[in-house]
Amino acid sequence: MAYTAEDVKRLREATAAGMVDCKKALDEAGGDFNKAVEIIRVKGLKGVTKREGRSTSNGLIAAKAEGTTAVMLELNCETDFVAKGDRFQAVADELLGHLFASKQKDLAAFVASKLPSGKGVQEAIDEANATLGEKVELRRIAVIDGSAAALYLHRTSPDLPPQVGVLVALAKADDVVGKDVAQHIAAFAPQYLNRESVPADVIDNERRVAEETARNEGKPDAAIAKIVEGRVTGFIKEVSLLEQAFAKDQKKSVQQILTDAGNSVSAFYRFRVGQ
């Protein structure tokens, strides 16, 4: 069965394979389009294991919020060329829709689940791996369910998909405050919600480092305890969302901004591609 240039084009669009590979597949398939798709898929899947050790430092953040449900995921690939492509972004959209519908918070359980089409999530990722010719992996997911939520996606470059994403769980819906706090989180990257959520071992380590630093600086023994506590307090303010100075008004903390608005934050998630 003969094939045309239009068949090659259609096969490239369907599989994201190169022109030469598409021609070879059509030759091998005797011009049968569906068989050619299967040939490319099989050949691509054979290369999946070879890509397992590769680094996936590129990709995108996808998120969706509606009502009292908000979800976010990070899908990784090897190059920004693939990250910018429609095929890769379509995979992310399909996974995001399934995540929103399932509200599954456990990554392993989500990857083991099935999409509405009946295809497994892992199978969809493996197919993307094969057709795109790069290692593709779902790195992490986040779900807020049962509370008002705000989301913010940030592009670090206009030609790239979102590289930073934030979800914020609020006591009540507030588009203005929610967006402001989400943008603040994107910019200042807090690690914890408040001082109470900073692990004791993290504080102990910071206190130990602060004391060693103060002694190395030659500070008098009588002043060291006060210096250490001051530095630990500064550290907590730096890493805790509610303790941080608010991006739009440095004279107020994020907690004060929320209090003024009659609102509160119970949780947040911040993803940045590759971090």
Model-derived features: where do they sit?
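N-terminal assembly/interaction segments in proteins that build large macromolecular machines
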Residues: 2-275
